[in-house]
Structures are given as C-alpha cells and as structure tokens.
Curated annotation (Swiss-Prot):
Protein name: Uncharacterized protein Rv2574
Stored InterPro entries: Polyketide_cyclase/dehydratase (IPR019587), START-like_dom_sf (IPR023393)
One Gene Ontology cellular component annotation held by this UniProt entry: plasma membrane
Gene3D superfamilies for the chain: 3.30.530.20
C-alpha cells in the first residue's frame, strides 16, 4: 500500500478532478444511510467495488475506517472525515494499492425531498506521476460510469425497500 495525501473536506470542492452527480431516491435519508452502512450493498450498485470491510466498530462516525477492494486489484484504505447521520458522509483514502492515486475523497450529501431524498455524490481526485494526463482523457467516461452507479443505486434501493414494505 502507498500513502495518499490526508485531505480534508475542502478537497471535495478544490481537487484537480471533481465529479459531482445527483440522484433522487424514493427512500428516506435514514434508509439511504442504512444502505451506505451495509458492506454487502456497495458491490450491488457501485459495481467497481468487489468487497467492503469495516475495520472500525459501530457506531460509525468521523474517524471510522474501512477497506474497499475494487476490480483490477485496487484497494483503498479509507477513513471517514465526516459522518452526520442522514445528511452527510465523506471519506478519504489514507492509502491505496496503486501509486497513481495522490489524493482521493468522496462526499455524500443527502437532502430530504417530497417522496424521498436527493443524494449528491462528489468524487475528488488528484493523480500522481504518469497517471495524471490519463484522467484528462478518460474524464468523460469516468463520469458516465459514476452516473450509471447512481442509476444502479436507485434500482437497488427501489428493490430493497419495496421488498421490505411488502413484508
């Protein structure tokens, strides 16, 4: 594992590469946080993720840690830098299995709306070394993938909570 810059919340506004997308979900903010805390749920909607392992006990909060394994053998050692139940959570990579990641953070902001909630997801990156120019080229494709993940999340939460309501 290679160290990443230990960025704060402001990185999700100032990073060299920012991706911000929004989805409206037909679930409550509480239900969304249930999904975001569920390690089995992440691979179901963010399909680049293969496994999530919480390395801190509940209750989760700022300072909580987890390991996220992704396709291509990439592993991120994450630390939550914000955990405001039902409104916001954000994490950064403290370490990554590739040297290409100089700094990485994600910010999930949740707003209650009529009939559910709105999730605004920001991914912030700073690449290192020769990987830097690659993201400039692949930026549109990455953003398409991120939007697809949010569509997946909507389908996943629709199915998960529709089944719960029928029980």
């Amino acid at each position: 594992m290679y160290p990443c810059e230990r960025v704060g919340l402001s990185f999700t506004e100032t990073a060299p590469y920012l991706f911000r997308n929004t989805v409206d979900l037909a679930i409550t903010p509480e239900q969304l946080f249930e999904v975001l805390a569920d390690p089995q749920a992440w691979p179901r909607w963010a399909t680049v993720i293969t496994k999530v392992t919480w390395t801190s006990p509940e209750p989760f909060g700022a300072g909580t840690t987890r390991i996220v394994e992704m396709r291509g053998g990439i592993v991120g050692d994450e630390e939550f830098i914000s955990w405001e139940p039902f409104t916001r959570m954000a994490f950064r990579f403290n370490e990554c299995s590739t040297r290409a990641v100089g700094a990485f953070a994600e910010d999930y902001r949740v707003q209650a709306i009529p009939g559910g909630c709105r999730l605004t997801w920001t991914m912030a990156q700073k690449l290192a070394g020769p990987a830097r120019p690659a993201l400039f080229v692949f930026r549109p494709l990455l953003n398409l993938a991120l939007r697809r993940f949010l569509r997946n999340l909507r389908r996943y939460t629709d199915a998960r909570f529709a089944a719960a309501q029928q029980s």
